Amino acid sequence: FKPEKDWLPGETVEKVVSVKNSGNVDMAVMTKITQKWDGEKLTLQAADGTEYAAEVQWGENVAAFAAPGVADAAAPMGIEKTVDSFADADDTWVLTDIKENEDGSQDLYFVYSGIVAEAGETSALLTSVTMNPLIQSGITSKKYEPNGSGGVDLVEADANYLDSYEDAQYTMTINAKTVQATFDAIKDVFGAALEMSDSDEEVVINDFLAANGMDKPAALEAE
């Protein structure tokens, strides 16, 4: 997802994201969203705190996992609802992890709380993206000098410190991953895709499996 180059402050671009099961088996779903401003930071410092230069309008059923570091980081990006368990998150996309990358991009990891049946579809993860209206065009101060012809010339102008975003390119990359809804498949695929520490991964995946009634196979229980 890449808005047009003439994207302006306060302008909203529609982008509805959901995942449909077009296969013939039940599936579990996770999504990785990568945001980046080419040449600029994702966040800007406003008078009342940190804000995102691109404001994502999330779907109605989006929450953050109430884990250390996740819920606090999710609030400034507009995800204020939190859940302690997938069992408390019916038909909900749950933000499980946030990673800040060296190139200035940011990765957001979401797991859909339920199992998507054949021909079923998740709720909307997001609906649109708006360029923060605080990014204003124009000049904040000007200096003029007489030009010798009875008029004046503009000799110095200080641009708004946020103007540079208008010349930067925002990109959102969305990678959805689906897996057959079995204990082993979810453990393997989600374990690799979530890119979490082993301890955090165990908490998230085990909670998801328990919330969806997926018990460890008897053969594994015996090990």
What residue ranges belong to the model's regions?
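Surface-exposed, hydrophilic segments of mature proteins
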Residues: 1-223
